[in-house]
Amino acid sequence: MSLRLGVNIDHVATIRNARGASYPEPVRAAELALIAGADGITAHLREDRRHISDADIAVLTDLCHKRGKPLNFEMAVTDEMVGIALNARPHAACLVPERREEVTTEGGLDVIKGQKRIADATARLRTVGARVSLFIEPDPDQIRACVTAGAQVVELHTGAYCDAARAGETARAEAILKRLKAGAALAHELGLEVHAGHGIDYATVKPVAAIPQIAELNIGHFLIGEAIFVGLPEAIHRMRALMEAARVELEVLA
């Protein structure tokens, strides 16, 4: 199975908004990312509009449509966001948990607890052809609940693994990676497409990319940060090279 790279450009907007300016433009970063080999663009329109704006979603949708690449619209499970997505008609909609006081998304959706609300949002989004993904922890019960909710895709939260690996907590990182592998296998077995993301950098990407059922990685903050030093195309090229190396090694082991 080939492995796609979705580039999240939220933090280009973070830099823009730090000065209340009109630049740097997220759409320009998105275009550079696609030229550099990204398979799609991810953008999270948060309820507080702390980075990506409604206007950004409009121009990103137009760019991705013109280039024949998917826009993955990350969003909270609210009537407002569902309405915006229904109007934008993105290729994909990824439902994520959201709390105003958090710095970034801190965990996965509780699909079991929010089953009706999530299922209703999923059904509405699918009426306009959006491929619905649910951002979750690699928990078997949550994965099964995604099927019940009508999702086509799960995105497994890799943040805890990446944090443990960077902290040198090897045993904890290996335990979380084991859960990610089991979760990906179960989701695939249940007919769900499997994505993964959050906190991935050059040091942590290969073990995640080596999970054979994963079809897509969504990476943003690290790539935008690395782009400050080496440029966005080079940052993407190196990430893709590591992803591809992990898949080649997987084939050799098989």
Curated annotation (Swiss-Prot):
Pfam families for the chain: PdxJ
Domain of life: Bacteria
Keywords recorded for this protein, A-Z: Cytoplasm, Pyridoxine biosynthesis, Transferase
A molecular function GO annotation: pyridoxine 5'-phosphate synthase activity
Pathway: Cofactor biosynthesis; pyridoxine 5'-phosphate biosynthesis; pyridoxine 5'-phosphate from D-erythrose 4-phosphate: step 5/5
Biological process according to GO: pyridoxine biosynthetic process
Binding-site residues for 1-deoxy-D-xylulose 5-phosphate, renumbered to this chain: 10-11, 46, 51, 104
Cellular compartments per GO CC: cytosol
Keyword Plastid: no
Reactions that this protein is recorded to catalyse: 3-amino-2-oxopropyl phosphate + 1-deoxy-D-xylulose 5-phosphate = pyridoxine 5'-phosphate + phosphate + 2 H2O + H(+)
EC number(s) stated in the UniProt entry for this protein: 2.6.99.2
Site (Transition state stabilizer): 155
Subcellular location, principal: cytoplasm
SUPFAM superfamilies membership: Pyridoxine 5'-phosphate synthase
Binding site for 3-amino-2-oxopropyl phosphate: 8, 19, 199, 220-221
Active-site feature positions: 44, 74, 198
Subcellular location: Cytoplasm
Primary role: Catalyzes the complicated ring closure reaction between the two acyclic compounds 1-deoxy-D-xylulose-5-phosphate (DXP) and 3-amino-2-oxopropyl phosphate (1-amino-acetone-3-phosphate or AAP) to form pyridoxine 5'-phosphate (PNP) and inorganic phosphate.
Family per similarity comment: Belongs to the PNP synthase family.
Assembly and binders: Homooctamer; tetramer of dimers.
Protein name: Pyridoxine 5'-phosphate synthase
Gene label: pdxJ
